[in-house]
Every structure is written in C-alpha cells, then in structure tokens.
C-alpha cells in the first residue's frame, strides 16, 4: 500500500482496532477446537482483542496459517491480514547448529547462508517474521538462554548478528523480517535469573552490551525486541531513555520496536514501577 492509502486506512480505524494491531496472540486463541483452561482460560483477553489482533505467534504449517488467516479476514472490518511470526532460531525444516555453535565457526558467510535457507523454508509455510537473531553478550552459564546467543564476545555477536539479519532479509521473494533481541543487557542479569535486574556500569553497558546491536543495526533489521530485564532499576520495556534516546535518536533505528513475551505487565508487577510510568 502507498503511504496515503495507509493514512486513509488509519483514519477509518477505531481506537480498539488500532490497539488490536499492537497485540500478538498465540495460535491457541484462533483454534476452533481448543479449550483454554486454567490460568490461560482465566486470563482470556476481551473478545475485541482477539477480533482485531495484529499478529500471531508460533503457528507452523501453511494449512493452519491459511485457515486462521481466511477466517480472520472474513470478520475483520478492514480486512487487514494477520502477521504470522515464530521463533525460527537455527533453522526451520532444515536444522542448523544452535547459535552458540554457529559462533564457533567464525564463518559469518555460512551463518548468513543458513539464515537464508531458514527464511526460505519459513516463508513457504506462510511465516513473515522471526524472533531472531539473539545477540545478547552471554557470560554466565547459569543463564538459561546461553545457547541462543553467539557467546561472550561483543564483536562476534555483532558480526554474526549482522550476517544472520542479512540472510533472513536479503531475498525479497523468500525472505522474512528479522528481529534483533534483546535490547539490551539481558545476558547480564544478576545470578543468571530471568527478569532480574542488571547492575553494570554505564561504560560496560554501552561498550559491551550495546555494541553488538550497533554493529548488527547496519543490516537494517525490521524489528528490535526489548529485554525483560531492568537496568539501574528501570525496566527496559518502559525505558524511554534507551528505546528512544539511544536506539532511535542516537543509533538511528527506524523499524518496529516489539516487546518480548508478556513483558509489558512485568514493567509494573515484577519491576515494581508505578502504573503511570
């Protein structure tokens, strides 16, 4: 669509429809036979959120995607299609080594080729975006996501991250949108515990944990994902200084900033920030 067509569409959308476009749900919410019980069932979003949701996580298989997309398009007032995304981390149908293993190759061209193959297979299934690459500098083996990173070196993370973004996005007909994650400092959480605070100096943060992003952003990834953690007791997902001041204004990122799985809620109830933050 042209810019003027998008502007016209936005002007015709209700507030609920615009909010819905910013919500991502799992495929279970669109499964006609699924019965959501327990905690998930108790936390079902309002019906209009499901009706106007903008994207879907983790549905694999072109037949499933086609079925959900067809039913969704029929009932959406503006027929805006869903965006299907998944964690295509180290391959889709053809599996490559985990990112930590790929880093050991010191071969960015090969890493880029593996990402290109994964993108081609994923796009043929109807997926349009992946939550990869993860370029968190990772030095604490207690942290449960070590294997998803390229290891302890900022430079290696940056080079391999850029290569992977190039591989995912380089082909217009078979490429998928890449997502750099997790901005920033996620690999330095205290004691390797998820959602924990990060307590490092500003210099270390910028020179070691932001550096890979600065390098990989040169490949122009479509998305950047925020980190679960807080730094200086400020949760990243609600940190204007980092997300706007550093990422957008200083580093020049013009793509989409996306939050991690359910990370908006913890801004208040995990990191104990005021609801007005």
Give a label for each model feature:
Residues 1-274:
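Glycoside hydrolase catalytic-domain context in secreted enzymes
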């Amino acid at each position: 669509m042209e810019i003027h067509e998008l502007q016209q569409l936005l002007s015709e959308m209700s507030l609920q429809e615009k909010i819905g476009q910013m919500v991502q749900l799992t495929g279970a919410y669109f499964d006609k036979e699924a019965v959501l019980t327990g905690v998930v069932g108790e936390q079902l979003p309002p019906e209009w959120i499901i009706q106007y949701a903008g994207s879907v996580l983790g549905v694999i298989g072109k037949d499933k995607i086609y079925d959900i997309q067809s039913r969704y398009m029929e009932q959406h007032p503006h027929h805006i299609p869903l965006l299907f995304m998944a964690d295509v981390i180290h391959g889709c149908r053809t599996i490559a080594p985990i990112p930590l293993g790929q880093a050991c190759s010191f071969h960015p061209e090969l890493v880029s080729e593996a990402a290109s193959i994964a993108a081609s297979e994923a796009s043929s299934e109807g997926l349009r975006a992946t939550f990869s690459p993860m370029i968190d500098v990772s030095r604490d083996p207690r942290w449960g996501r070590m294997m998803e990173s390229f290891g302890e070196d900022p430079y290696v993370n940056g080079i391999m991250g850029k290569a992977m973004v190039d591989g995912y996005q380089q082909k217009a007909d078979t490429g998928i949108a890449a997502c750099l994650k997790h901005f920033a400092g996620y690999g330095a959480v205290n004691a390797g515990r998820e959602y924990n605070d990060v307590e490092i100096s500003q210099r270390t943060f910028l020179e070691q944990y932001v550096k890979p992003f600065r390098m990989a952003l040169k490949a122009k990834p479509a998305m950047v994902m925020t980190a679960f953690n807080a730094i200086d007791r400020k949760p990243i997902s609600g940190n204007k200084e980092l997300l706007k001041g550093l990422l957008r204004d200083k580093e020049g990122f013009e793509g989409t900033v996306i939050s991690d799985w359910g990370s908006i809620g913890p801004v208040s109830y995990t990191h104990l920030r005021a609801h007005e933050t």
